């Protein structure tokens, strides 16, 4: 239920909006100008939805930055992956049973808040990127293993109102949220308001890059929001992170985020909301910003926000959002003080400064994402050292998994294109992947396949063993699949120190694969380079990856692309029509169940995956 006070016409549109500035100024003149971006969005939803009797007290909490009282938060959407999202929907299906048994209408049990469920957590890379049929084989295995789950989820798509289901094989929840699902500014029932969401995954803040508050929550809290109840919260510490300087040539967004992760962990920003701003932030594309926002949980924070600005507008156009929606985002942000230029007087609990020009080529590891490892320090850190490669045997420190994976990096076209260019130069020079390396490429969006084909880089990646194995989380969430049995046995018999290199966001011991004793996070182009090197004992900046036809050593600098090369391909090959061609049909998919959908689920008594919740018995 929306309030009536402070509701006004949004100029240049047929929509209304809530004048949060006026509501704040009525309590304390001049206060709105000092509010951070996050506070302005939290205040808006209070003006729009809060009980009028509680509105003044709730807004005073935000104005005076009181953190000792709860206030209601009404997210606009719920986004779920298939693991926790499925659990929430099982609860709702059980509730339908209980209501039916009491003589009620089970069809009335539906999410009130729009809910989007994306199946992305269940695909394992059983077949690596060197298998030309890997995608089809991995998907077939996924469907076979998850038939019970997918049957239930498909029923939910048709049985419940207000739920969109994106079937398996279409991408990662966070990347689809960034590229399609978030409108940035909602327009419902004649009212424009900021998009916000909760998601059943810790990396839900990925879409903070668009200026959308998106928090990772557990399944129970997601259920609460689905059913229209507010999520009660206290005002967090809101910390400004001023980005200054300009990144050095050859530095990727991955290098930047790994350096920022180390920096912010040292600054102790646990549970804080971060707002990145300054000339450095303004220079970053949304792809770069998303790489940073995605690793918010690795910072220890709850949100990693960027302001709405021209980069936001450019990205919405690039990803095929409708012109009317793009215009609404700009108009609303400028009218309500959410545009970057309107936040120059914002006051924060703390302001931290990070210089982008200080970033060098980085990895993270072993074992922790905040354990930054400059590639220039591999020898001094004891990672790179003397090693020998005996014919027919794996070396010490063998890289057994090299995975271009995760929405952290595959939602950033510059990172993906850089990997393709490294592959192309490596192929031209005759370099090959080491045979013990299980390589894979799992983009978080089908759009990546289109622009890589358009640029001619997908065949280059495939030649090195980085063919597309799926559009899902895969190796990043531990679904790296089985190793070749001979390789696995050699690791066991020789007690080898074996490793994984991936473009993901977490590398805790044992997470990536039981036989990868440690794992390292790296940019997609570095992942390709390590597949060629084949061991972490290799000094990636200094050692020779191979020799050319004249016998000259080939090092990383010989295959690393320039920024100009990367940008030229991104500008020529990433197009709005690609996003439209992927997403327009995706959101119209209905899975044929072969029968008329009933309001009650027909529980499978022998299922070990999906069972009727026992706590509704006698409810």
Each language-model region and where it sits:
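Fe-S-dependent hydro-lyases/dehydratases of central metabolism
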Residues: 1-619
